[in-house]
Amino acid sequence: PMRGNIPIPEIPHGEDIWLIVAVTSIRSRRTQQGVLYCEAIGRNSTGTIALKIWGEVLDTQGELQAGLWGITGKLETFQDRSQFVVSEYRPITIEKYREHQTTDPVLPRAFTFDIETLTLPDFRERVGPQLERLLRLGNMRLEQQQRYLDDIAAEEERCYSLGSLSATSGRVLSIAVHVGPIPGLEFVGMEQPETEHVFGIDADGFEQGERRALFDFLELMKNFDLESDELVGHNIIGFDLPFIFQRCLVHGIQVRPFVNLSEFHVRGVFDTMHRWWLGAKRNVSLDDIAWALGIESSKTSEVEGSKVFDLYQAGKLDVIREYNLNDVRVTRKVYERIVASFGR
């Protein structure tokens, strides 16, 4: 008899096996010869496995959609990559899944996040000498220097404020995260909880420190599954993710980046800025996209990104915390709209 319900890490190669899994991330592909097939991800309480379904199987079995399925096939290796080649599949109920797995399926999650940053206080000591070299003040007579003092002071303040945009001169103040279902991957009979988190500023508006914020964020992300979960944000490939990992380096925190930012199409990441441009590397603000889509902005007359430093100086950390969360809520709405129109 065919073996089945084997823990995913223990599936042998080349043997017919049946499994019960939650299927996600289905994508149509073609070989170099033009042969149609689908790639998908199967997931249950024992692990995650890459699935491959050839066109002739799709023709006889019908469309494979995200959901709970009983599948039959063999584990094979293609170009040094193991895939479970599916020969048959049929939909199952959540009750049937629970009967074989004893627990509910681990559903794909979208982690939508945003960071707020501040310039390091010590950076001010570096700005002055850098400006002196840039403006060649040493070559000016004293009366010339006096003439430009106001301009120099304004430029020094501007350069200092921009320090928050680099991990060499800035730090993380807070990280806000929304965890919820991936749009279009809702499962019948199951409700996926949605949660919000803020690291770095607690619910009472007290600062917790950058090191703790980084640790707490990494703790939340420790079970992030690159094959089925998604990390969502606006310009996170170009800013937020590198900034977080670089600040971990500064603090000596051991971290294996859970996404590969060097990839042309970064797996496991949904960057709303890139998706707005259909993958092109161009800039657009989250606020501009939200306005175009009729989504209420997170910015107010009191708070926006450029005012975070002043709010911090005024001790209004609770306002910064709520602004950080609102940015995430807006990003989540933009994400849902893009997926609804463009798909995955």
Residue ranges and their predicted role:
Residues P1-R27, P91-Y97:
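OB-fold nucleic-acid-binding modules
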Residues N5-P9, T24-R29, C38-E39, C159-L165:
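Short secondary-structure capping/turn segments at boundaries of alpha-helices and beta-strands
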Residues S25-G55:
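OB-fold (S1/OB) nucleic-acid-binding surfaces
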Residues L36-A40, S82, R109-F111, L173:
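Short beta-strand micro-motifs in enzyme catalytic cores
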Residues G55-T72:
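Short nucleic-acid-contacting surface segments enriched for D/E, G, S/T with interspersed K/R
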Residues K74-H100:
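OB-fold/S1-family single-stranded nucleic acid-binding modules
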Residues T103-Q246:
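Conserved non-catalytic scaffold segment of RNase H-like nuclease domains
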Residues G170-E207, F224-E322, N326-R344:
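Metal-dependent phosphoesterase core characteristic of DEDDh/y 3'-5' exonuclease domains
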